[in-house]
Amino acid sequence: MADHPEPPLTRIQQKNRDLILQGALSVFSVNGFRGATIDQIAEAAGLSKPNVLYYFASKDDIHKSLLTTLLDMWLAPMIRIDPGGDPLEEVMAYVRAKLDMSRRYPRESRLFAYEILQGEPHLTEILGGRLRNIVDRAAAILQGWMDDGHLAAIEPRHLIFSIWALTQHYADFDVQVRAVLGPGHDPFDEAGPFLDNLFRKMLGV
């Protein structure tokens, strides 16, 4: 007998699921996977523990679902790189999108960094396939532009790594950045023109 697809979630079910994932983000970003409990997640979500377990069978399931959701969000700007667009402007649009994500989603960025440093198996499993495939696609687009003389020739994957490092730093090390800059500085407003200038000089031909 063929499997039947699960019916779509109702509006209330989707709302509760989102509340659980937001609560899980708060808990995991402070305590990590090992230190987090279902009770803490339920409290952060404003739901009962049985209600949480209605939507997710275990802490494992919540963690995997949260990381998958974060990865989807994290990869979206890279997927939007258009091979038919202006090469330098496509790269700069990606840099701006990544910096904007660091501004708007600092907890998500820090959780991702924390889980990578901890070597969480869920993240290794998720990253090993989809992330590599999307990076391979972006690297192939960049390499094509370089081969055609539209961008300076550098190793495309390390270019991608440098974009990640130079944008996510402002979320992952926010306290350090603000302490060094001192009062009256907006790190993101100042980082935007700096990164634009840096990558244009690096890639311009």
What is the predicted role of each segment?
Residues 95-98, 112-115, 163, 167, ...:
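Short alpha-helical scaffolding segments that buttress acidic/His motifs in well-ordered protein cores
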Residues 2-4, 100, 104, 132, ...:
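C-terminal peripheral helix-coil segments that are non-catalytic and often amphipathic
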Residues 19, 23, 27-61, 65:
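Helix-turn-helix
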Residues 103-125, 173-181:
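Amphipathic alpha-helical segments used for helix-helix packing
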Residues 79-108, 156-163, 192:
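Hydrophobic alpha-helical connector segments
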Residues 7, 64-93, 135-144:
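Amphipathic alpha-helical linker/stalk segments
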Residues 89, 125-130, 146-162, 190:
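All-alpha amphipathic helical-bundle segments outside canonical DNA-binding/catalytic cores
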Residues 1-15:
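N-terminal intrinsically disordered/low-complexity leader segments
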